């Protein structure tokens, strides 16, 4: 699959995850769907790791080939890789909290859980928007509006 098409699909999957996490946050504290929480706990870490690995191997490598002489592009990709690492660490924390919600653990503070969920999905959405904007900008910079 072409790198940008793959990235569009990955972004679609991540945004769907964000929508699910937002629904969980909106259900707190009274209407928690424990099954949804347990499923999200199982999915979030592996999904984020797989999508980030694919993005770095397919898309970032593709960009690096086309912009090999551009230090600003390399700096941008390093920033995005760092954000991937941060998102994966945050996903681990969410996994623990979602597991506890899924198991009906009454010691989970609903307000804290809501802040954690909202912080994560807001950050992921912002990251996706930034990536899309940067890619559009990079592609326009090439003569003829396409990468070489």
Describe the function of each predicted region:
Residues 1-148:
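Small-residue-biased structural context
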């Amino acid at each position: 699959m072409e790198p940008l098409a793959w990235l569009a699909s990955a972004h679609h999957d991540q945004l769907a995850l964000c929508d699910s996490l937002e629904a969980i946050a909106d259900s707190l504290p009274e209407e928690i769907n424990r099954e949804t929480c347990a499923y999200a706990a199982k999915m979030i870490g592996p999904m984020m790791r797989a999508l980030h690995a694919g993005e770095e191997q397919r898309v970032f490598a593709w960009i690096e080939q086309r912009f090999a002489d551009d230090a600003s592009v390399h700096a941008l990709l390093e920033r995005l890789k760092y954000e991937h690492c941060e998102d994966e660490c945050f996903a681990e924390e969410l996994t623990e909290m979602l597991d506890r919600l899924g198991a009906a653990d009454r010691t989970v503070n609903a307000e804290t859980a809501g802040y954690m969920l909202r912080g994560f999905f807001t950050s992921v959405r912002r990251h996706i928007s930034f990536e899309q904007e940067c890619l559009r900008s990079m592609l326009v910079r090439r003569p003829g509006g396409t990468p070489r």
